[in-house]
Amino acid sequence: MARESRVKKTFLNMRINMVTYLVAIVISFFTRKIFLDQLGAEFMGLTTTVNGLLGFLNLAELGVAASIAYFLYKPLYEDDRDKINETISIMGYLYRLIGSFILAAGVVFSLFLPLVFKATSFTWSIIYLVFYGQLFCSMLGYFVNYKANTIFAADQRQYLVNGYFQLTQFSSMILQAVLAYYTRSFVLYMVVMVAFAIVNSLILNWKFEKCYPWVEASIQRGKAALKHRPEILLYVKRVFIHQIGRFVNNSAMPVIVYGYASLTMVTLYSNYTLLNNKISNLIYSALGGTEASVGNLIAEGDKQKIFDCYKELYSIKFFVVAFLSLCLVHLNSDFIAVWLGTEYVLPAILVTLICVDFFLNLARNTTDQFINGYGLKADIWVPICRVISLAFIIGAGKLWGLIGILAVPVVVQITLMHIWKPYYLFHSGMQISFGKYWKLLFVNLLPFVIAYLASVIITRQLGFDEGLTTTWRMFLLKAMSFSIPLFLIALFLAWHFCEGIRMFGGRVVNKLS
């Protein structure tokens, strides 16, 4: 029964999240054009940079959410409500402390904003409105939404969080776009963002109370219980180091780009990362609902089932990510040129580095899921190396500019996330030969090497290899001439080479029948 329930919830996550993110992608690209035209590239760069700066403050979250989710897998599986209430109370207590600290630190940090944005054309009232608006939205996660976000995710109901969030996001972005088009008001843009963040919190917590009316989070109980649960703080300390590593890869990059360029360059960079992030979210929404499923499967302890699950998830995610990454490398700039204009196109080498980092960041997802499922957080030197790499990123930025800034994370990702972490999982988690990972990587990579070379030849034969496309019609023709052969050839080869692809295909057929 647990197996059937886990599979059912996984497919439900996939279906619902896929629909919401497809709609989100369409709305995001439509509204992004309006925001750039009406509010300007500099303002959009300001919001992106402020978000990155707040990432520094949010490091204080320490990885508590990920840690608590880990300690909820087993009690949710066993329906141990008392343990669930105790664990979520501990989270409430920790989040009360962390949220208060971040709020105070944010107020102090805001005093230095004139030094950070001294070269901008915005008034200080606009800069402070953007900063405090985004700070307020982040506070909702610490004081209001933490129970719903954590339990829904741990109980494989992440589709509810994503669904309600996307619904309010749709409404917010459409209203922001309408107001931007008619008023060009920075103030109204931020007011709408804050208002809909509040609406999302109200809806999410209403649904949470309906699904889990028995959950009671007590700050006092959490404070007392934490003294008897030292394993939680130990795990939090380990996760925190890993949170720093993620911060280097995500929040720090826009700030570093701003440090070596301008808010406008941040916008050009973020246009590409927006496209990549939307696709990344789409992939996660479709395939990321397996997070809690993996945790529950590992809790059952069947080693053969665990490895079979890893192999299947690795293969299907690799296929999807590799296909989309190669499409992005080949078509990204054409899309930007048609969507926003050629003035927003970055040099090809920068686009390639952005897309390679996109691939590496997503292709590691299966390994990360299983490491989290096993609770393996002892390899603290990995995120420490990521932090040290920040110095290399800054140094490379001084020497080679944006190329250096984007190249260093690629090298770090390959070394740490695609060599060391799989070894760590296979050795300390699944306890099987690391050679099986190299074999799995090879049989998944080979079909795409062959398929990509064949697709490039086909595209060139059709005359789509010269210059950027300038119309949607030409872009669609170029996209189809490349992506269709790539998909069909890769699928044909993967079906013959990859057992994981065949396993997933059989599962889908059985589900449909």
Model-derived features: where do they sit?
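N-terminal membrane topogenesis motif
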Residues: 1-28, 82-90, 125-127, 204, ...
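Interhelical loop/hinge segments that connect adjacent transmembrane helices in multipass membrane
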Residues: 1-10, 187-190, 204-251, 293-308, ...
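Short runs within selected transmembrane alpha-helices of multi-pass transporters and secretion channels
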Residues: 20, 24-28, 50-58, 62-69, ...
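Helix-terminus/linker motif at the lipid-water interface of multi-pass membrane proteins
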Residues: 26-44, 114-119, 180-183, 247-278, ...
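Interfacial/gating helices of multi-pass transporter permease domains
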Residues: 35-58, 87, 186-191, 227-235, ...
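Interfacial segments at transmembrane-helix termini and the short loops linking adjacent helices
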Residues: 113-134, 328-359, 365, 430, ...
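Membrane-proximal transmembrane or re-entrant/amphipathic helices at the cytosolic face
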Residues: 2, 430-435, 455-513
